[in-house]
């Protein structure tokens, strides 16, 4: 019987997280897109590469030759992956993309149309390739706490973190035990949430930390306190239902013992 309760816990979690994750993905995309269009002063993908993506020629003055080469390689990899995404979308007859290639009035796909076909992983990689100034601009538009993020890496590191969970939800993989986790959180990723929310520690080893990161993003994205609190209550209800249905020793393995206290800290932060 225990397996059935676990299956229900996992399905209920995915159902709860899906809509909120899609909202976060779309909202962050819109903020990043707006910043890129303003900073490149253009909607051309080529202008984006030239003006807001880091490469050998616009690397920081302090960069070594090796660092400049790495930035250039990342830029080429980005161009490669964007071309592949466009080619795939065209092959699949995606109207968001074919419209621009099959229409004499257009010479290329605009940046905003590219954003419509980007996955969360693509978004994370693009953010990681942007110049420091543009990453700084996006971080500030989002109101991320940059005091513990001198290199402005949080905007893409957190997207990569959420992307692992998002893909697990989309592919109906198991989420309750965070086996989808592909990242090793940096000290800035931990420090930012500890400082902002007042948590004793953060490690992304339990689903609670992902709930915390999603709530932090919802707050940054101006979601109402009422809506975020309702989301937390629903999460608590799902975990409580599981806890009541199984043997306490089993529940203690699946549900982290300090989950309740962490959720209270989170609610006080809101």
Set out the residue ranges of the language-model regions:
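Long, contiguous internal "core" modules enriched in hydrophobic/ aromatic residues
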Residues: 1-270
